[in-house]
Regions:
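N-terminal Rossmann-like FAD-binding beta1-loop-alpha1 element of flavoenzymes
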Residues: 4-30, 183-191
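Conserved acetyl-CoA-binding loop of GNAT-fold acetyltransferases
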Residues: 195, 223, 227-228
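Short beta-strands and strand-loop turn motifs
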Residues: 80, 199-203, 230-232
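Residue-level marker of alpha-helix boundaries and capping positions
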Residues: 8, 87-88, 177, 209
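Glycine-rich flavin
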Residues: 1-3, 19-26, 31-170, 203-207, ...
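Rossmann-like NAD(P)H-binding beta-loop-alpha module
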Residues: 157, 168-205, 209-210
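Conserved acidic residues
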Residues: 112-114, 180, 233-234
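Conserved N-terminal Rossmann-fold NAD(P)-binding element of oxidoreductases
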Residues: 8-9, 31, 139, 177-178
Length: 235
């Protein structure tokens, strides 16, 4: 099977490039070893915002009396249903991206692609036992989660954002190393779910890329909710 262009990696860069290439008349094939949509859709922006919306509803019920609404003082929640809703949301959007790609004539291959050589001026790619010949290759493989070199970390069971998104049970307490956007999103969610949260940040303030006044205001609001902060702290 021959193609004008192969794109390795089905994240935002990869699937957008595949769509544009196909729209411009190129016979296009897209390889993805995990899930179409990349980190943002499957393990980042979308799932975290879905979880945070559930947390927002829970917080709203808890504070309903402020607005003259009589509600349960201690509303409960079903973690399994919260996670299931998150998974369904991600699945729906992933299927939407796939449908858009196939509708534009892009061939999608789910598996790990390997460039194995050249043949008559074409590049040879193997994936799941099949061979593909392409004229051009665009690599959009993204990145992996960076694990800091913390002494003893490899000896304990730690989470990255990936594990934190697929839970069966909530921990009683949680230390979050890093007070950036991702860290604070998880701090907000777990705090709303009743988990005792501590945020450890090596910089003088959380959300270091934001305006200092905004970061300080957000930290103050989180502290009111019970989140503990350790700034200027290295682990």
């Amino acid at each position: 099977m021959e193609y004008d262009i192969a794109i390795i990696g089905g994240g935002p860069a990869g699937y957008t490039a595949a769509e544009r290439a196909s729209e411009n008349g190129l016979k296009t094939i897209l390889f993805e070893k995990n899930a179409i949509g990349g980190v943002c859709l499957n393990e980042g922006c979308i799932p975290t915002k879905t979880l945070l919306y559930s947390a927002k509803i829970l917080d709203s019920i808890k504070s309903a009396s402020k607005y003259g609404i009589v509600a349960m003082k201690d509303p409960s929640f079903d973690l399994a249903k919260i996670i299931d809703r998150k998974n369904k949301t991600v699945r729906k959007l992933t299927l939407g991206v796939k449908a858009r790609l196939t509708g534009n004539g892009v061939t999608i291959v789910e598996g790990e692609a390997r460039i194995t050589g050249e043949e008559f001026g074409n590049i040879r790619i193997h994936c799941d036992g099949k061979e593909y010949l392409v004229k051009n290759v665009l690599v959009c493989t993204g990145s992996e989660t960076g694990i800091p070199p913390i002494k003893g970390l490899s000896e304990v069971k730690y989470w990255t954002s990936r594990e934190a998104l697929d839970l069966n049970d909530l921990p009683k307490s949680l230390a979050i190393i890093g007070g950036g956007v991702i860290g604070m999103e998880f701090a907000s969610f777990f705090n709303s779910m009743g988990v005792k949260v501590k945020v450890i940040e090596m910089l003088p303030e959380i959300l270091g890329n934001m305006d200092k006044e905004t970061s300080a205001m957000l930290r103050s609001e989180y502290k009111k909710k019970g989140v503990e902060f350790f700034l200027n702290t290295k682990v």
